[in-house]
Amino acid sequence: MFLNKLIKNKYKQNFFSFKNYCTINNNKPLNGFKILDLSRVLAGPYATQIFGDLGAQVIKVENVGKGDDTRQYGPPFYVDEQGRKGSAYFSCANRNKKSIALDISTKEGQDIVYSLAKESDVFIENFKVGGLKKYSLDYETIKQINPSIIYCSITGFGQDGEYSKLPGYDFSVQAMGGLISITGDKENPYKCGVAIVDMMTGLYANIAIQAALHHREKSKDKKGQYIDVSLLDVQASFLANHGSSYLVTGETSERVGNSHPSISPYDSLKTKDGFMVVAIGNNTQFQSMCNVLGLPHLSTNPLFSTNPSRVLNRKQLLSILTNETLKFNTDDIVKLLGDSNVPCSPINSIDKVVNHKQIKHRNMIWNLPLNENNNNNLNNNNLNNNNSNNNLNNNNNNNKNIQNDKGEYIMNSINLIGNPIHFSETNIHTPSSIKSNIPPPFLGQHTDEILKNIGLNENQILNLKNNNIVQ
């Protein structure tokens, strides 16, 4: 078969074209690395999106038909001018990737993965333990094709142990890993507002892969390795002071709402028109807060003069402070306290965050045309700091709020929250660098391009499509 012939010929062609991948700026720190992404949902895709943001080439392998599960997560959904459909959920972790849709249960589909893996630096997946072995896409098989590859598996509970075969989801691991037990008020445990375990697992996976790449570059034989990352391990690792406190005392932490078990006042406080938070870290900050609120005597009161005493008398202290903060509008009291170097902030809704002047100043909202060919024509005003105070609804996407009869948002470009890393020498937040990003791909958007880059002609690609092997 023609794909087997490609493998025997040792894949003389590169699996992906540098020229086609990045339209403007290829001076990003991970430029040159090639990532083959068979993961889906959030943890794996978040890890590979970071690679893409930093300049690596990422190919996302998806199922024929439905693709990544998160393509169905919604509403909200959006469509571009060509009627191609995307989901807001999918878009949060899948920019800077190119999508190929193929059936890995077929020999032809597996051969395509082999040809891509041959030229890849990294292979990442989050199937159940052993899930890819039945498709001959497990580490032992892939490393025979490419001994230098870094192969990362993300699972709920790791590759071994009695829980290893169980499916793992962020919500269940937040519960099993103790996070929900310390989140919420005394009566009601709550999950985090975002899938924090998935996100942290993606970060750990990315760190682990970069460490393995560094080790490979230093080693004489340039040998790759296998990486096993699990959601439960990650959740346990960031129990932080709650975990260490138990290991010291043998006592578990109680839920204290927005309070801190060891610091006070470190809490949310009501204001005249909403809520604010204060995060007092030392006695000097507490004294400053008391002075602003007209309570200078409070900082010398033995009940509140030290942090341990404030923790013991937390309820009484918060009642006194709230009586004063209720006299102010949120913005006013936050400014007064901030001017006195008291750590505090309003509790912002999402719209206030993405339109915040500091977020805009830092170029943290990236506007990407859904048609990649329009990258060079992207209006710099969307990216220029001079316009950072403009509201997103009026600035980046005039069609943002228009919906069709299916409730889908009609969009020519998409706003995304950008990568938070700021480099001095390889700045990924300049207008030209932001313009070089590619939007979250539609399912199979780059199938033809990728297959042509591994040597297939149009007739061969059409044959694969007719047999539902690729899309």
Curated annotation (Swiss-Prot):
Keyword terms: Transferase
InterPro entries: CoA-transferase_III_domain, CoA-Trfase_fam_III, CoA-Trfase_III_dom3_sf, CoA-Trfase_III_dom_1_sf
Pfam families assigned to the protein according to its UniProt record, in alphabetical order: CoA_transf_3
Top EC category: transferase
Keyword presence, Secreted: no
Low complexity bias (residue ranges): 376-401
Cleaved signal peptide residues: none
Stretches the record annotates as Disordered: 376-404
Binding site for CoA: K128
EC annotation from Swiss-Prot or TrEMBL: 2.-.-.-
Active site: D198 (nucleophile)
Alphabetized GO MF terms: CoA-transferase activity
Family classification: Belongs to the CoA-transferase III family.
Protein name, entry field: CaiB/baiF CoA-transferase family protein DDB_G0269880
The organism of origin for this protein: Dictyostelium discoideum (Social amoeba)
